[in-house]
């Protein structure tokens, strides 16, 4: 069990890291010659924390967007209202139900996951349209666990400009969100990608984020769980890379000589 001193040190480190992230976001936006940032708001803890960082980095030039599809966010709007009250972030709602239904019908995709992944990809396209309209960068909400596991949609929620919390484990996200006074209901909500009704991350993965946190911080966990986590990481390596390219023609020519 950690002592009070250790807990205080960890919280102080997280608070300092949060301050660093705010300055990092400012720097990256400045380097890109942009005016601010935009973030998709789901009602979950990851987007709530990124919303806090966005507002702190750009009090006048930050925007949150909710993008419900069907009933995917019907239970989240009360939490989003609390987040808006806390952060004072401007949050607008863009209902993508009709757009999704039309695209899904046109594509006529039968595979359940392929069809579900249209949702985050449609949201990505919407975020970038709004970001370009405002001359903003898009902030992603993937944490370290999700990034390591590849637990995101390629060119969906993984298609962003900046990933501010991608080096924070789930438990660290929770702790920093608590420091920023994010509502308890958001913090305690079961993690879900929202790809279909009643979907829960940990049920789909087959292990908990707590176990992933321990694995990522080099702590002891069940060897079978560790093997599953590492296998998931290896299988999703392509998600963390830009499109794979062949050998350069000059290198090819030199190799053939």
From Swiss-Prot:
Coiled coil: none annotated. It holds the Pfam family NAD_synthase. It catalyses: deamido-NAD(+) + NH4(+) + ATP = AMP + diphosphate + NAD(+) + H(+). Its EC number is 6.3.1.5. Mg(2+) binds at residues 46, 146. Keywords: ATP-binding, Ligase, Magnesium, Metal-binding, NAD, Nucleotide-binding. Catalyzes the ATP-dependent amidation of deamido-NAD to form NAD. Uses ammonia as a nitrogen source. This is NH(3)-dependent NAD(+) synthetase.
